[in-house]
């Protein structure tokens, strides 16, 4: 995944133009060695290049969960983090968020984790994915547009990591790939504080996937029932239905409100 705060000099339009008096933020640098010209790779190329999933860079941790248990019967949560040092992804599969992955000042600064939870609502399975766009410190607010762009670009890779890392589950229950993916973007800025439906998982994990604006987020039953799972009082991600005004702080426990996520 691209670093979400590694390109602070980019403008929010993503395709900046420069006047004759201005210099580009990331000028091309050339080195001459042995008579050859070697042009360095600028950060923009990585930022706007294709998002590619590499299975060899994924580390999977199963923490207190039955690999073969259907998520409609046992809570199943994904916690995905990225190391800028090793370029590796770490995916924890457990019943609750793996907060140990999210500790430390660097993770608090970057906030590039993705957490997700399987939900059964009115008898239908769906995957609810959460991304932190802004809030927490001023840098995240300044670059909220850029962070939203990067999260959208990298989410297909994230979803592929979920499917690959939890391979036994999908082999046993292939119908889960038909489940809708709901993406919750958490931000102090209203423009980026929203919920999007990315369609079925098998489509959402493709780079060309788009949002399905005609679909509405399903609502869980307000009382205990057998068609919704996990129950509201047991949900490992207790966020409100509406992302507006909701706090998303996975390091200290996600959300401050309980709702029908």
Curated annotation (Swiss-Prot):
Top-rank lineage group of the source organism: Eukaryota
One of the record's GO cellular component terms: chloroplast
Coiled-coil residue windows: none
Keyword Transit peptide: yes
Localization, UniProt: Plastid, Chloroplast
Disulfide bonds: none
GO terms (BP aspect): chlorophyll catabolic process; regulation of chlorophyll catabolic process
Induction record: Up-regulated during dark-induced senescence.
Record's keyword annotation contains Chloroplast: yes
Transit peptide start-stop: 1-54
Keywords from the named record: Chloroplast, Plastid, Transit peptide
Known role: Probably involved in the disassembling mechanism of the intact light-harvesting complex of photosystem II (LHCII) in the thylakoid membranes. Required for the chlorophyll breakdown pathway. Acts independent and upstream of pheophorbide a oxygenase (PAO).
Family, similarity comment: Belongs to the staygreen family.
Miscellaneous note of the record: Corresponds to one of the seven genes studied by Gregor Mendel in 1866. The green cotyledon (i) line JI2775 used in the original work has a non-functional SGR protein (AC A7VLV2) due to the presence of a two amino acids insertion.
Protein name in the entry: Protein STAY-GREEN, chloroplastic
Lineage of source species: Eukaryota, Viridiplantae, Streptophyta, Embryophyta, Tracheophyta
């Amino acid at each position: 995944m691209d670093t979400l705060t590694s390109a602070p000099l980019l403008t929010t339009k993503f395709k900046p133009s420069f006047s004759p008096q201005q210099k580009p933020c990331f000028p091309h640098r050339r080195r001459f060695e042995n008579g050859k010209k070697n042009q360095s790779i600028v950060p923009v190329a990585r930022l706007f290049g294709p998002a590619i999933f590499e299975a060899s860079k994924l580390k999977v941790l199963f923490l207190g969960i039955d690999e073969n248990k259907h998520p409609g019967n046992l809570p199943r949560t994904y916690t995905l983090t990225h190391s800028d040092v090793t370029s590796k992804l770490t995916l924890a599969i457990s019943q609750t968020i793996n907060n140990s992955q999210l500790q430390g000042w660097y993770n608090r600064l970057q906030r590039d984790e993705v957490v997700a939870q399987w939900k059964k609502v009115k008898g239908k399975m769906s995957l609810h994915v959460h991304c932190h766009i802004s809030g927490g410190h001023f840098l995240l607010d300044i670059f909220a547009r850029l962070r939203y762009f990067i999260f959208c670009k990298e989410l297909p890779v994230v979803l592929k990591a979920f499917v690959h890392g939890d391979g036994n589950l999908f082999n046993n229950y292939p119908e889960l790939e038909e489940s809708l993916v709901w993406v919750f973007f958490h931000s102090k800025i209203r423009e980026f504080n929203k919920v999007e439906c990315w369609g079925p998982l098998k489509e959402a994990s493709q780079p060309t996937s788009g949002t399905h604006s005609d679909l509405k987020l399903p609502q869980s039953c307000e009382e205990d029932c057998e068609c919704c799972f996990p129950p509201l009082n047991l949900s490992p991600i207790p966020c409100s239905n509406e992302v507006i005004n909701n706090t998303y702080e996975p390091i200290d426990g996600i959300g401050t409100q309980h709702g029908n996520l």
